[in-house]
Regions:
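Extracellular receptor-binding modules and their adjoining Ser/Thr/Gly/Asp/Asn-rich linkers
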Residues: 1-133
Length: 133
């Protein structure tokens, strides 16, 4: 059996400690289940707040601040600094943003990986890229 969907990610609802906009990098923690990332290379990565998931799990979850986090698939993500296609992304020191993992003699622990960049953002500023989770 095959199914089709217009959008490209599988997401699940979690209780957040505040309202978060789509594309925000999230970690496990805070006063609820999830909060936005706030430390570079955090090992507590939960995922990225989705925009329009193809499939949404835990749909009945209710609360003051429910966020849908992409678990697999293709989604936009807030980033800091230059990102090239194929870069492994980790949490940055800017809350809710990812950055490219350094590779010169450095191994990124898999628990710290958010996903891989599908598109590019070549400026030093903040921006948005498509990623594969």
């Amino acid at each position: 059996t095959a199914t089709q969907a217009t959008y490209a990610d599988l997401a699940e609802k979690y209780l957040g400690d505040a309202d978060y906009e789509p594309r925000t990098v999230m970690i496990l923690g805070g006063s609820a289940e999830v909060t936005q990332s706030d430390k570079k290379n955090s090992p507590a990565i939960a995922g990225v707040v989705t925009t329009n998931p193809a499939h949404l799990m835990n749909e009945g979850l209710e609360g003051d601040h429910v966020v849908a986090i992409a678990l697999r698939g293709r989604i936009p993500c807030k980033v800091k600094g230059p990102i090239r296609k194929g870069d492994v992304l980790i949490a940055s020191d800017i809350p809710g943003h990812a950055e490219a993992a350094p590779f010169k003699g450095y191994q990124t622990p898999s628990v710290c990986v958010i996903g891989k960049a599908i598109s590019e953002h070549l400026q030093m500023s903040e921006g948005i890229v498509e990623i594969l989770v």
